[in-house]
Amino acid sequence: WLLAGARLTVRDKQPLAQMLQGCTHASLVPTQLWRLLNDDAALSLKAVLLGGAAIPVELTERARGQGVRTYCGYGLTEFASTVCAKEADGAADVGAPLPGREMKIVAGEVWLRAASMAAGYWRDGQLLPLTNDEGWFATRDRGEIINGRLTLLGRLDNLFFSGGEGIQPEEVERIIVAHPQIQQAFVVPLDDAEYGQRPVAVVECD
């Protein structure tokens, strides 16, 4: 966008609708776009890139009715965000890799490679490698590639997303069972129209 002559707007700690005043393009999670449309606020947005959760067709159609084109994307923080993108069309796939990104499926898992990606994970004073010896990053996402387009099928672990935030059930369970009156806890995702999924804890108490 910047190379194309656009201006980047950075605003801090304001309501979403206020932050986006005057903006024509934005990257949002579906929950944020739902809230914008439900507020009936005047929108200057022309196009929105959506990601971080399942994207309902109802949402993209409603946005289109208000003059906002929507694009669905798949990305990771390790890759400076977007890896695949396409204009939302109701199909299940998230599009083809953007220029400079490579993608393949290994034993049902999505593997990625690109020049613009993180050098590694910084832990305990050390930079841990992100990729294997051939430069491929194993995402832990399940997927399939049909006609060059990626369709995501879920996770290989228990991670799920709520409002664009990744939630690892085991981490939440560990905090819950730290309470002296909780014997055990099990956290599961529950489908939610606004957040995509919400975490729900089933607990056994003393």
Positions of predicted regions on the chain:
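Residue-level signal for inorganic ion chemistry
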Residues: 1, 26-29, 48, 52, ...
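Anion (oxyanion) recognition and catalysis
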Residues: 2, 64, 97
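AMP-binding/adenylate-forming catalytic core of the ANL superfamily
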Residues: 114, 135, 140-206
